[in-house]
Amino acid sequence: MVVGVVWLPLEAHPRPTHMSVNKTAAEAEAGMTLAEVREEILRDYRICVMSREASLLGRKEVLGGKAKFGIFGDGKELAQVAMAKQFRPGDWRSGYYRDMTFMFAIGELTVQQWFAQLYAHADPAAEPASAGRQMNGHFATRSLDEHGNWRNLTEQYNSSPDISPTAGQMPRLLGLAQASRVFRQNTALHAHTHLSDQGNEVAFGTIGDASTSEGHFWETMNAAGVLQVPLAMSVWDDGWGISVSKEHQTTKGSISTLLQGFQKEEGTNGIRIYRTKGWDYAHLNKTYEAAIALCREEHVPCLIHVEEVTQPQGHSTSGSHERYKSPELLEWYKEYDCNVKFRQWILGFKPGGEAIATAAELDAIEQEAKADVRAAQKAAWAAYQNEIKAERDEALGLIEAVDPAIAAELKAEMNPGRKEILSAARRALVLNAGAPAANDLHAWTERALEENRERYGSHLYSESAQTCLNVPEVSVEYAPDAEMVDGRLIIRDNFAALFEKEPLLLTFGEDTGKIGDVNQGMEGMQARFGELRVSDTGIREATILGQGIGMALRGLRPVAEIQYLDYLLYCLQGLSDDLATVHWRTRGGQKCPLIIRTRGHRLEGVWHSGSPMGMILNSVRGVVVCVPRNMQQAAGMYNTLLQADDPALVIECLNGYRSKERMPANLGEFTVPIGIPEVVREGNDITLVSYGSTFTICARAAERLQDLGIDVELIDARTLLPFDRTHRIAESLQKTNRLLVVDEDVPGGASAYIMQQVLEEQNGYHWLDAAPATLTAKPHRPAYGTDGDYFSKPSIEDVVEKVIAVVRE
């Protein structure tokens, strides 16, 4: 059964590269000639067989040793061609590693590029999705020009960058769809025509049926039904999750049946649910045309459950599905193979009483596709190998002059990679240090290592002119009679200034809207700027993050609020796997300048006093991490970040909202430099480094220590990623010769990270006359209450005693 399917006029959604869905002869007369119908059907068939040939040949290339791993879209071709017909310029995809046919069909992936990714060709010209950084089947388009500026996203087909974790694509899909709602309903944004055509874009999502068991899927679909955003979710249902059948995956064995409670009815929100077969060309086309029309025009989310999809080659090159699938099922795969069924349908389709194609014509298409795929594979392999062979030949001459035996080993390698070349060069240098010819080889090796650091490691953070590192510092200003106010008022009024001057800015989270967040940092903002820009969400951190990622990918400036730092764990997977890697895994092809606002460190209770900074730091490289000591510093960081294009996490101090601070005069203007610590108190006896809420403890301890004759140099790290770019802490050590790092993470957490940065990166150990020390929270979680806090986290007395111990060593 297909729910709510209606026919639409042929001309309703014209596409520049594909015509509308095929009709009967009578319907074709109204909008398409039979010749055009025939042309479209045969083009679709060619895409399907070309994609299948790529999958088959790709598997052979992996098993033959030319590539490391292969995962393919065979069996899903026909549904993806039908979906592609409804995909317009400006639309967005958030899918997964089976979608090769779709990418071929919209013209954003060539077969040669597909093979280039299979071989890990680390050149964005050859492999524009990830420049060889991702395994095959991970697709993306390029949203940025060579300077890191937005292209016109409404004139191109857009795909967000795929990740491997199952259902990991779901949260960002929600944000991609919500952006259309924002662009449609906020008329102030209608002038941003390079980002949206007044919200007429659909966000297309795809997922394998087994992955619908993941929480991300349910959280996203529920939120989409609440928000009413143009999200079109396709489920490719082949009945398996690797070796586990859907009887063990899904209640009642059907995701569309299970979702019936989500069904949108008259006068309600929810989603529209459609069901179709992966081998039924005509029905697929009808279903997608109806579903996407409703989604695009009325912003009603939909789910298209594509059943009876096959998997001819099994899950991937990792193993054989013959181990766990029955012979009967494998025979059924052959009978209901979508390409086989499509061929049968074409031969039986006679709109004018005559078949639109003969078996011989289809045979010719298949042979041509096979030849074209083979040619593309050869071209991709040659392009990939030619670069490396040139590097090998250059290295061989230099290695031979130093160590002929190692050179001979390298020459004997079949299809060596850069690893083998550099490994040989470095071995030769180690074994022949001091050889006359070693200098030339050393110079070549250093140059090659630097080139490969760039080739595989660039763009972890923004490298554009808009990087946060380039935002000029603007000092905070105070009126002579500046009022002492609660810190929350500085945050509130600073955000108000930012909302006034930046129409792309919006914020959302649990309790963010109506009450202005649980600490009143957004008090009155929803009434002032509207529910579209300052909104509440459900309790669903993974998709709060996803909303931010998706909207930031589309050029909006979202501030996603996670109510407490302790709850960041609910969205840490997306923060680590998706947000932190966007810029790197596209080699600068996309950016995601999302700001995550949260609050943490000491307050009351096990799950309202967390400071798991080591866990965060080791999970989110690629994200700027700011740890302000007060609300003026936090406001300055927001002012900096909103002028930049890096993703960032700002952790406000939970116990700072009621602390009194002077109200700045230049709200929305003053900035805090990223990666530059601040020496808040100068001293000569010891360098004390801290951040966040613990910094206040250290400041009070420093006053007591002064009375004891110990002169503390107190430094606020301010940001942990990046950390002390100017080596200000090492400079302090040259004067004090002693170091203590204080925080409220567990032992070996962020304090150990800071110590590594100071001692190893900054060579701070040169200046020490005493062993460097850390003072941290206890290994257990913070206990409840004032006494629990005192005996769980560093106190003023702890800091004083630790400083005395270090100074007296």
Question: Where do the protein language model's features map onto the residues?
Answer:
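Conserved acidic/glycine
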Residues: 9-10, 16-79, 85-86, 312-529, ...
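Active-site phosphate/pyrophosphate-binding segments
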Residues: 590, 600-604, 608, 621-627, ...
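Thiamine diphosphate
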Residues: 77-81, 158-401, 405-420, 506, 654-809, ...
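Phosphate/diphosphate-binding loops
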Residues: 281-301, 361, 585, 589-600, ...
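Short beta-strand segments
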Residues: 95-97, 167, 206-207, 234-237, ...
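Cofactor-binding active-site loop characterized by glycine-rich and histidine/acidic residues
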Residues: 53-234, 239-241, 245-263, 268, ...
